[in-house]
């Protein structure tokens, strides 16, 4: 989706952690034949100022990138370590054939990646494994090429995770709470992407109603919901 002449966001998936339909679920949505009720795990490509930035890389990544409008990628931003956001990282190997591929995440996320993918980070890695540069970030803005990225710390139940601001876009997923300080920083942003899991309460994700309340506080020009059942 083109927001303006500079920024484009392509949603690779907007589903919850199990995807939609969910295995073993026989609710109306999961039995639906409507293609709009088919959702892969939440991920997006942000194209801005010539850079192609992937946000999250879940278990559906290979399928998602093969059907994307372009498969060019320059970097990966991770929101957090949960499997539905990192399980596709091994499939980044084609992007590291010619250069080491950068991944930006909180230090605790990168440390867990080293534990989960030890074959990528040995002194003498096996030929063909992904060559990854794990870049630790804090709450300060950082550069991905010529693009400034600002972390947006939010809570996922009791887990501190990151949303990201890239130019006119803020992308927030898996959030259950955003502090007043972060809300203040986002007020008036042109384009907001935020999770809205369902109408029923959930301990670690915003409901549709809670997401709408955040939207009313931030007052973006355009809002898209993601990470939905």
Feature roles, as predicted:
Residues 177-229:
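Cap/insert and terminal regions of metallo-dependent hydrolase folds
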Residues 1-172, 181:
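Binuclear metal-dependent hydrolase catalytic cores
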